[in-house]
Regions:
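Long, ordered, helix-rich scaffold segments
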Residues: 1-214
Length: 214
């Protein structure tokens, strides 16, 4: 265990912390989280950054919320890297952990992304892009397909909105207004009944966290 906590190779460290999270002692949680923070984030590839954040996520999911000091340290470590300039998958992992930790800047950073985030080829977002390829292969149907795709729900924006729906503190009137305007727009997308139901559930969860004076 001590060898795992002092491992210098980031790939081996991530694998070791994931293994310990699944079978280890919860008393080691803070030591494990500190070990993950010892990694130089900027020297990692994007794929390794995703693995690092998933290791944070698994440790906390299995062992519980860290204490206030450890929580603040993780926020200080991860917050400067969000939003990332890389792919959507990295940003999804970051917002999941930062929302769980209730990082104070996450709302101010995320709400503006609701209107500009675009889907990409990252995990979970290939379907719309694969459909877009049809436009190139079948130009005679291009305009019709493009119109259909333009009405599909933007998955990255939906992920951000849902991640914020459980956030209870730190909302300003301006952020709340911008946030709920996204839900109003989202109901116009053609995602089917399941999407509408999902969005409505997310909106209702978010409404529970609106201050009573709003």
């Amino acid at each position: 265990k001590q060898k795992a906590l002092t491992e210098k190779d980031p790939v081996i460290l991530f694998e070791s912390m994931i293994a310990l999270a699944r079978k280890g002692d919860p008393k080691d949680k803070n030591s494990m989280l500190a070990a993950l923070q010892s990694v130089n984030y900027d020297q990692l590839t994007e794929s390794q950054q995703i693995d690092l954040i998933r290791a944070f996520e698994l440790v906390m999911a299995r062992m519980g919320m860290p204490d206030a000091t450890a929580k603040a340290a993780i926020i200080t470590y991860l917050d400067p890297h969000y939003p990332a300039k890389g792919g959507n998958e990295l940003n999804r992992e970051l917002i999941k952990v930062l929302a769980y930790l209730d990082a104070p800047k996450k709302k101010k950073k995320t709400v503006p992304l609701l209107s500009v985030a675009k889907d990409d080829n990252s995990a979970g977002q290939q379907s719309a892009t694969n459909s877009s390829d049809l436009i190139m292969r079948n130009p005679q149907y291009g305009m019709d397909i493009a119109k259909i795709l333009s009405k599909l729900p933007p998955l990255q924006q939906t992920f951000y909105a849902t991640a914020l729906s459980q956030v209870k503190t730190g909302w300003t009137p301006a952020l709340l207004d911008e946030y709920f305007k996204w839900y109003y727009k989202a109901f116009n997308y053609k995602g089917g009944h399941s999407f509408v139901g999902f969005i409505d559930s997310s909106r209702k969860a978010a409404l529970k966290n609106v201050p009573k004076d709003r």
